[in-house]
């Protein structure tokens, strides 16, 4: 499954993996998964976190290592119910629910994920996605960016 990913995708997933792997030991625990999900405004139960880990924990050791994470991401990318997932992701970024992701909202979520970005980097991310040039990202623009990944 993961062999269908490009080098660029693998590099991006490695970066995402390290956001989850807070202590840098090469494994994501339920505790680390919970921390990241809560920073994104989700509130999973311990049982839900365990289910998520069990779903991809090929060797059964109770944690997710990078190859297992890659398989999960490859599966998620093939998922056809991505429309609902995209809407959910957009809602996570769109803090005030006004239908737009502002630079401030983008910075807030990225900071919660542990990504310290400069104002220039945040503005650049907005510019890359902002097709109509209004300085913020609407849902259609968000979908375009996410589908291009």
From Swiss-Prot:
Positions with a binding annotation for Ca(2+) 3: 94, 96, 98, 105
Pfam family, any one: EF-hand_7
Residues that bear N6,N6,N6-trimethyllysine: 116
Keyword Transferase included in the entry's annotation: no
GO cellular component: cytoplasm
Protein residues bound to Ca(2+) 1: 21, 23, 25, 27, 32
EF-hand domain residues: 8-43, 44-79, 81-116, 117-149
CDD domains: EFh
Amino-acid positions noted as binding Ca(2+) 2 in the UniProt annotation, renumbered to this chain: 57, 59, 61, 63, 68
Further details from the record: This protein has four functional calcium-binding sites.
Family the UniProt entry places it in: Belongs to the calmodulin family.
Protein name, entry field: Calmodulin
